[in-house]
Amino acid sequence: MRYLILSLSFISIISFADDHAEETSFPGLVSTESFNLGNGMEMHVERRNSCNQDGTPKHFHPAAGTLVYVLDGTSQSKSSGDWKNYSKNEYWFERSDWVHGGEADTPSLPEGTCQQLLVIRVAEEGKDHTIFID
């Protein structure tokens, strides 16, 4: 009887966990850390590695701004108004609340293109620094 109860409990946990929609995130997210800056502000640092990635899901950042630094490879952004490729040791800035990602005009990068990115954002403590849009 004990094994039956344990088995049913395990199955119900698996069913419950499988019933939830997967949360949207950035492709290739390797790590994310937050640092308390004081005065109600936090710095969020993300590291991402991906290949053959021509875009991201539609989103915006209600942060003071976002700096994206290319550690290696090639990435692209439309933050300047036009699509631009960025390579190792280059970076771009994304203004607060700029809706981007999921654009129909996102250019395809050559097959096998990889990028390693370091993303830094400063946002109000306890608030979401990235909002994905359906």
Question: What residue spans do the PLM features occupy?
Answer:
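Sec-dependent N-terminal signal peptides
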Residues: 3-12
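A short, N-terminal "cap"/entry segment at the start of jelly-roll beta-barrel domains
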Residues: 6, 16-44, 85, 92-95, ...
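Extracellular/periplasmic catalytic domains that process cell-envelope and extracellular macromolecules
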Residues: 38-39, 61-62, 69, 84-85, ...
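Short acidic-glycine-tyrosine-enriched beta hairpin
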Residues: 50, 80-99
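N-terminal post-signal-peptidase region of extra-cytosolic proteins
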Residues: 51-54, 71-72, 79, 101-104
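A short beta-loop-beta micro-motif enriched in histidine and acidic residues
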Residues: 52-66
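Glycine- and acidic-residue-biased ligand/ion/polar-headgroup-sensing regions
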Residues: 63-81
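Ligand-binding loop in jelly-roll beta-barrel domains
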Residues: 97-128
